[in-house]
């Protein structure tokens, strides 16, 4: 069995892992951590206090940020203590530092969250300000060893999601059951953003939303209980998210969702979320297609996904496309983790997702599939159809998983073949409970190289219809010269070669592959001279092993009637006629 597997391996559809080192290094060079003036603004000097009301603290913190920015920037410090507050607006050249043992505690009071321009599930709108918000700013940061708590719970923001288990009741007047379909309708109609007012419509704000900003760092803070998505950079560039700890089990509690962003590094973060850990986006349907700005040049590395629906997710709001995403050296393990790499989209979205690289990921378990590509996500979505999405150039390598339902799950479209050039290389998936690979709809050029599922090598599309062809070409690839089939360093007349070439010739007879016949011809052409002399053969040795290869010559002569082959056969037959025998008449 081991020899068989070794023989088959060269025929597996081989693919390099596709990792683009040059682009990876270019992204690293483009993402420079912001630098700030060495000047400190303590929020307590502006009236903030653990004993103050949320409204007073909000005013004080925003005043400190405003003054810091106007004076050329620096560090706005939140010292130890818990500060109730409402929405905070970050300004250019400001580093908001939440120090150790400090907590910004955002309260559930709509009056403290003014209406601002943002996006909600990929649709442009005017909605409640995110807890920390910036628009059109440069050189900004959120740092420190402290905590930002969005105050999400079943008693506050989360009940607006419209689900019983998060506190929603039919008596609740404000929830996304009202706002979400309204925003869908306005977005599909192309309504001006300023007229898409979601006040009192139940659309929860993000914890951090940095819109149209450049030069961003979010480092070392702990982020808890977001009303909605946790970190949401939007239409922004040059972003570093490093050493952040996220704990958010609320509805739609995505950890970090860069949307239509360029040059992003997410490094050394820990995610414990009620939805996707990282979800890359670029706008939904009409809005995303109108802006048509991809998320691109993103590095995800050294992260731990403790809990969440998906580890690295692309979609579903990706109408603007996604490209050049690198994920490496991460650990994932949770019964609630459904997928390691997930790409989800549909024909309302359109867009091209390409150049996705995933390597060196260790997974304890995931609920559904290690890799899931789905072009039929949310099939009942009420939006304009006909925008065919494309997913191509996806490379996964050196990923291990101890338990899942599927290894690879690909759901293409029935009427368009837009999933292709997908590579899974040197991966081991154990404990796969259903199918190693499941495909629906159309897809092509799916390549597996050394994909081992439950201890067995998996090939999606065997390169030959018949095992005999497969084995023959495997050996031809291993030893391009038939006269070296027996692993010798120089040609010799060999029992081993004869016993292997004979079934190869049978394969030619069955399937008429001329390359096999030519391969077989090469041995006698090399070994038998015109006069019938056989290289390496000695009549006087009376070695019966040398005669075994004559079987092959007899069969080959019927297809390749060369005089030299006939003379060679006669030479061997002469030995048989004179071979010493026992008294019973059989050969020694």
Per-range role (PLM):
Residues 1-5:
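Sec-dependent signal peptide recognition
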Residues 318, 336-458:
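Extracellular beta-rich repeat passengers
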Residues 39, 74, 81, 86, ...:
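The right-handed parallel beta-helix/beta-solenoid scaffold, focusing on the short coil/turn
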Residues 73, 85-88, 107-109, 128-129, ...:
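Short glycine/acidic-rich loop motifs that flank beta-strands on beta-rich extracellular proteins
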Residues 115-117, 121, 521-556:
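Blade-loop segments of beta-propeller domains
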Residues 100-101, 138-146, 214-224, 237-248, ...:
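Right-handed parallel beta-helix
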Residues 459-532, 562-571, 575-579, 583-584:
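Low-complexity, Ser/Thr/Pro/Gly-enriched N-terminal "stalk/linker" regions
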Residues 7-95, 99-220, 228, 242-244, ...:
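Extracellular "leader-to-stem" segments immediately downstream of a signal peptide or signal-anchor
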